[in-house]
Each structure stands twice: as C-alpha cells, then as structure tokens.
Amino acid sequence: MSGAARWWLLSDLHLGMSDDDPRCPGKMLPEFLRSEVLSSSAPQQHVVFVGDTFELAGCAEDESLARLESIFTRHLDAFWALEECAARGVQLHFVCGNHDVELVRPSVAARLSALLSPAGATRVRVYPWLLHVPHVLVAEHGHQHHALHRMPELLRTAVSGTDQLDLPPLAAWNAHRSRSFLGRAVAVARACLASERAERRIRKLEYDELLEAESLRLALDGMALRDLARLSRFRTVTALPVTAVRMVLAAAGRSVAGEAAPASAGRLARTLEAHGSGVAWYVTGHTHRALESALESCPTRYVNTGTWSSDVRGRGPDQSDRGAFPYAVVDVGGDGAVSGGLRYWRPDGG
C-alpha cells in the first residue's frame, strides 16, 4: 500500500436479513459508492468498512454462510455496487466488529470475496481485528476497548470463528433473554470469569504466535501489536460498576459518553508512537457517535465514523438530519503527505 491514494472509511451499517431501518443504509450505500468512490480520479482507491457492516455474529459456520447469502439477497443493490467497485480496481477492506465477527471465518470470508469480486479475490480483504497502513492510519471497530464487548482472544476467530470462544459479558446477557434476571446475571458472571482467564491466555506463547503472524500480515511491529492486544484489559472489578452506572443513567435518559475521543484512543496512538509505528489517523466505529478529535500528547488525529443506521447516539449533524451519513476520508499524496477528516455525505448532494 504505497503511493498516492484515497481511503474512504465508514462503519456500523448493520445490514441484516431485513431492510426495515428507516435510514435505509442498504439503499444509501450504492448511491454513496457511485457518487463518491466510482467518480473519483484517485490513482489508488480503498473503501474500508470499520466493523458491524453486517449482522453476522453468534453463528456456527453453516449458519454464518446461510446468513451471508440471505443478507446478499436482501441488499442486492449494495452488493452489486461493491462488485462494481472491485471490478474497477477499488480495494475493499472489511474490519470485523462485534456484530459481524463471523465474517472472518475462512469459509465466510472466501464467500464474501466470491460474491464481490468473482474474477479476483485479492480485491477483498477481511480483518479480524485491525487494519494498518504504515504511517497513515490504523482502523479497528473499537469493541476491544469496551469491556463488556471485548474478546481478548480475538485473533482466534480467523481460525474457527467464535466456535472455541466464550461469549463476552454483554453477549452472554443478551443470549439468555428467556431466563430470569438471576439466570442472566449468573451467565454474565461466568462470562466475566471467562474473560479474565482469556486475558491471561493472551500473555502466553501460543497467542504470541498468532500475534506474530498477524503482525507480518499487517506490516506492523510485532512488539507494538502485542502491546495493543493488552490494552483495555478486561477487569471485572472495574467493568461491572461502570456498566451499572451507565445503565442507571440510560434509564434516566442520560449518558456518560461525551463528544471527545475516548481515553483508549490516546493510549493506542501513544503505544504506536512508542514503537516507532505512529500513524496520522486512528479510526474506529462501534459507539454510533461520529466525531473527529485531536489526541492528547500525540500527533495522531482520531475519527469515529458513527453509524449509517437509525441508532445515532452522537450530537453531530446526523442527529438532527438523518439524511447525513458520516464517513472519513484519508488522502495520501504522491509525496507521502497525509490529510483528511470526518465528512458527511447527503444523497441530495447538500
């Protein structure tokens, strides 16, 4: 990935087997791709989906494949537009989120590539955790920094999906809706203990080998990637009280989330800097709060690409104008200069 290029990054479309979202992200995506991407004259073009592109989580392999086919059938225009992009040389990148973690299963990723780029699978890449463009950007969904969604052994999903992994605490709560409150609480407690055990396992040799292989694939310093894997460690003693406070505030119609970059963004950017792997931009999704911000004690700028679904939680233009769809642009000049930022696309061109 070198030379002049333009990167478009967007997230949290939540395309599923139905199409009942009032913002119609599945219908808006092809319009965006044709008006912004396919009309661009940039010599290299990349579109990055920063997680939760699809509703594809908690499924075994066969069900994951079947769901992907159903999503394809429901959102044909979106998939055809993506196929057109790939056919015209646009590189498509899919970073997995907590809602589409099964996308990285080898068979599912291969099927996605076959659907979007029948003539050349190299045009479609799927990432279990993050995408790294040296000196330019790092993009990840962001759920690894949210304790109740965090999956410490995330890289194992690229081998067998979530088959061998315990559910994160919040997923454990949601997986047992028919149980009593006490039964669901017990499931969460067990998931917390499992997360604590998983945090210890990622510090052992077996997981180090997965990290080393991923660092080579990402062209990212191995020690840097190891340290990133250990950021935002799950700790029950801090996760549950914070969650309880958020639940109480949410019930009262309030939120503790502000409009500034999360502390984890600064920690990640400074970790990269410390290893000589600093980047100009750090991009996430997950929170459904679109924003751009400077980071403390670091030259890296942070962008959250918000959501294209109706569940907008930020205070940006998309809160009052549901026809404003957030995305990030990162331009790399022929001289290596990097620029960009958060943008809003409107179907009417406004």
Report each predicted region and the residues it spans.
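Extended recognition/assembly regions associated with phosphoester-bond processing machinery
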Residues: 1-350
